[in-house]
UniProtKB/Swiss-Prot annotation:
It is found in: Secreted. The lineage of its organism: Eukaryota, Metazoa, Chordata, Craniata, Vertebrata. CDD domains: Kunitz_PPTI-like (cd22608). This is Kunitz-type serine protease inhibitor 3. GO terms for molecular function: serine-type endopeptidase inhibitor activity. Its main location: secreted.
Amino acid sequence: MSSGGLLLLLGLLTLWAELTPVSTRDRPKFCYLPADPGRCLAYMPSFYYDSASNKCKKFIYGGCRGNANNFKTWDECRHTCVASGIQPRIASN
């Protein structure tokens, strides 16, 4: 296979890995933590993974403390925590 073909294959595999949501058994443990706004009073719209509904939901992060189940974007939350085969919509609290 030519170097151009190998480069194309590598690019396609990388794209596939980025677009494939995580499977249930590979989900990080922090995805099961509850939403935690922290102790500070900033107003930072964020997303957390709700394991009961298998959806990423909006919440307001205060800017400090909290926990690792806190994502700046819905896509980041979905790619990290949502089980494969399910394409949930953005859900509000």
